[in-house]
Amino acid sequence: MNRRFLIVLGMCFVIGSAGRIPAQAPTPAAAGGQGAGRGGQRPATVATPEDLADIAKLANLPAWVKGSGDGDFSTGPDYAPAPEETQRVGIPHGKLVEFFVNSASSKVFPGVNGPFERLVSVYIPAQYVLGRPAPFIFAADSYGLRDRQLANILDNMIADRRLPVMVAVMVANGGPQRSLEYDTVSPVFADFVETEILPRVEKETGVKLTTDPEGRMAYGGSSGGAMALTMAWFRTERYHRVLSYSGTFVDLRESPEAPHGAYEYPEHFFPDQPVKPLRIWMHVSENDLGAKTASADRRNWVIANQRLAGVLKAKGYHYQFVYSKNSGHVDKKVISQTLPQALEYVWQGYPVSGK
């Protein structure tokens, strides 16, 4: 029987204590098999004094304030929802179009446990001009749309000309195959989105989505954050903008191309390869997953994000790294306060009037 996975903001299926997961081969046959086999459980090693000292430095980063440029910042310990989240009267309000995609028709992810239905939610701003290629956000886990968080933010910020007139494409994950989709360090998920999701979005909504990578942003939290960076890293010709909360840049799902999973980003990919035209906003929380785990395990979310930020700085990327005090993994109160300003940073340089 088909299942409908309605995944909203607070639902993050990250296994913080599991052993490393070997990736399946990125082929339709593998994607439709029995799912990824998990490696043996391995006990976590306690963080060393040096690890804890490195993490402690994050609390002393300068405060993240409106207008902050590139660099490393901190926020908290107290939080309040951003005013942009509140629905305003007297401004144009976008509409929400929703439909289901049945995995049985997918050549990439037909379902590890059989066919299922995946919800796709599309925000279309009232100012969108039919036929004009629209910049857009692609978001994992249907982040923030069904509870109107992101829709309200976009309504308000588009009306105030702080963001371009943009579409938001929110796609539910594949349930039991979420890690296969998001944690696999390869172009497979990005290609799935390009060939199977975005064409359906255009067909169902009548919206034309831009092919300009400057007008495309990938967004997610936890493994979805890793997915967002993976989409832009492997398909830079399609995505130049990335937004990540508590990104799972750790050794979670291995493959020959990525022996240490998404930890390859801070460890090898960014250090060893030429600078790509990416603009990245990334976050990690004080009490994020694995915060007391040794850096040598490559399973400490705080240290992994901290090290990725360090590499981005050294390589000269446009990036912001925000460390949130008194907060946990993909903490809703942090997102509620920071998302509008994060979006504004990520979309810097893109004309508000569009292209």
Task: Set out the residue ranges of the language-model regions.
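Non-catalytic cap/lid and distal C-terminal segments of serine-dependent acyl enzymes
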Residues: 31, 35-355
